[in-house]
Amino acid sequence: MRRYHKMEKIGEGTYGVVYKAQNNHGEICALKKIRVEEEDEGIPSTAIREISLLKELHHPNIVWLRDVIHSEKCLTLVFEYLDQDLKKLLDACDGGLEPTTAKSFLYQILRGISYCHDHRILHRDLKPQNLLINREGVLKLADFGLARAFAIPVRSYTHEVVTLWYRAPDVLMGSKKYSTAVDIWSVGCIFAEMINGVPLFPGISEQDQLKRIFKILGTPSVDSWPQVVNLPAYNPDFSYYEKQSWSSIVPKLNESGIDLISRMLQLDPVQRISAKEALKHDYFKDLHRPPEFLNGVH
């Protein structure tokens, strides 16, 4: 760790403390120190293998993992540094983002996700806090792959409850078949939040989270979601709710935006649109794409 000089603590994430630091060449970076439970026997070798794979991810919309440093009791991930995240931006923008900004951010989120999904890596814990933004308006996804390496704890490093607001209904009901669709659900929730300025499903417990989802999307049935009855937490006596119209939920979205969000926020994961398909959606046809969007990875 002598190569890095800690400048300040910048956050406490799901897995540990994050510091702003400087390396010997004067470059600013972010150090994410992964805490290992005291009773654990050091860092699992599987985690180190998983994390090492993430160093191979190179994409303009993925936060670059520059280095991995591990000692017996601590794993430090060295990332490129970005000074803003989507949560801070949304907190500062009353009433949601400008439509063109929301569209640009959504496109970039989907590009990053599509790239990771192509590499068979899921995020599983997407939320505005781990979508980082630089001053040029480039958005990058942070913490990809960490859920598989370390499992998402119920409580974070600081003992805060890890948010359920962006978690898919299939996961909330105990599905262990994680697929790319879990990330698409999270993106749909973030899309609505960028437009409305407030979280779409701000639940306080798993039950409350499901109730909020069903109040908007309607209570699932075997007809609308055939596999729902096989989920561990499925309850045939869930309160019955009618599906609401998307135009009343996201009134500022145009017709193509409503079509896209409705394809993302499908209760049945099999019916959710893929990131690759979403990138081709009509909603983006008028998006001004900077050259790096068109050239792909650089």
From Swiss-Prot:
GO annotation, biological process: cell division
Entry EC number(s): 2.7.11.22, 2.7.11.23
SMART domains to which the protein is assigned, alphabetical: S_TKc (SM00220)
Inhibition and activation profile: Phosphorylation at Thr-14 or Tyr-15 inactivates the enzyme, while phosphorylation at Thr-158 activates it.
Cellular component terms per the entry's GO annotation: cytoplasm; nucleus
CDD domains the record matches: STKc_CDK_like
Keywords assigned by UniProt, alphabetized: ATP-binding, Cell cycle, Cell division, Cytoplasm, Kinase, Magnesium, Metal-binding, Mitosis, Nucleotide-binding, Phosphoprotein, Serine/threonine-protein kinase, Transferase
Molecular function (Gene Ontology), one example: cyclin-dependent protein serine/threonine kinase activity
Top class in the EC scheme: transferase
Domain Protein kinase: from-to ranges: 4-284
Residues annotated as the enzyme's active site: 125 (proton acceptor)
Catalytic reactions of this protein: L-seryl-[protein] + ATP = O-phospho-L-seryl-[protein] + ADP + H(+); L-threonyl-[protein] + ATP = O-phospho-L-threonyl-[protein] + ADP + H(+); [DNA-directed RNA polymerase] + ATP = phospho-[DNA-directed RNA polymerase] + ADP + H(+)
Compartments reported by the entry: Cytoplasm
Pfam families xrefs: Pkinase
Residue intervals passing through the bilayer: none
Binding-site positions, ATP: 10-18, 32
Residues modified as Phosphothreonine: 14, 158
Family: Belongs to the protein kinase superfamily. CMGC Ser/Thr protein kinase family. CDC2/CDKX subfamily.
Function: Serine/threonine-protein kinase. Involved in the control of the cell cycle. Required for entry into S-phase and mitosis. Probable component of the kinase complex that phosphorylates the repetitive C-terminus of RNA polymerase II.
PANTHER family: CELL DIVISION PROTEIN KINASE, CYCLIN-DEPENDENT KINASE 5
Assembly notes: May form a complex composed of at least the catalytic subunit CRK2 and a cyclin.
Name of protein: Cyclin-dependent kinase 2 homolog
Organism for this UniProt entry: Theileria parva
